[in-house]
Amino acid sequence: MAKQALLQRELKRDKLVAKFAKKHAEFKAIANDFKRTDDERALARLELQKLPRNANPTRQRNRCAITGRPRGTFRQFGLARAKIRELAFAGDIPGITKASW
């Protein structure tokens, strides 16, 4: 189980990303628009830099919903591989069966 502080930090990042998502997308679009002047694009980059560091979606980490494990997490389920195996064998995940051939 991951430490609670790490999980809380992730939740805080999620909230910041959601809060600044619109601004981040606008500045990003301006900065990457080659039809704009160089000054406008440079200004947009400066504004992007002024946003909080954790407002950038690339700083988010996928974690297991049960254990908080940061690695080996399947996006489709939001669970770590060990928990998927555990729940699948117990029959708690619909549609998952053990492979046999």
Curated annotation (Swiss-Prot):
The keyword Glycosyltransferase does not apply. One of its GO terms (molecular function) is structural constituent of ribosome. It comes from the Bacteria. GO terms for cellular component: cytoplasm; small ribosomal subunit. Pfam families: Ribosomal_S14. GO terms for biological process: translation. Gene3D superfamilies: 1.10.287.1480. The keyword Transmembrane does not apply. Keywords: Ribonucleoprotein, Ribosomal protein, RNA-binding, rRNA-binding. Part of the 30S ribosomal subunit. Contacts proteins S3 and S10. HAMAP family: Ribosomal_uS14_1 (MF_00537). NCBIfam families: PRK08881.1 (NF006477). Belongs to the universal ribosomal protein uS14 family. Binds 16S rRNA, required for the assembly of 30S particles and may also be responsible for determining the conformation of the 16S rRNA at the A site. This is Small ribosomal subunit protein uS14. It comes from Polaromonas naphthalenivorans (strain CJ2).
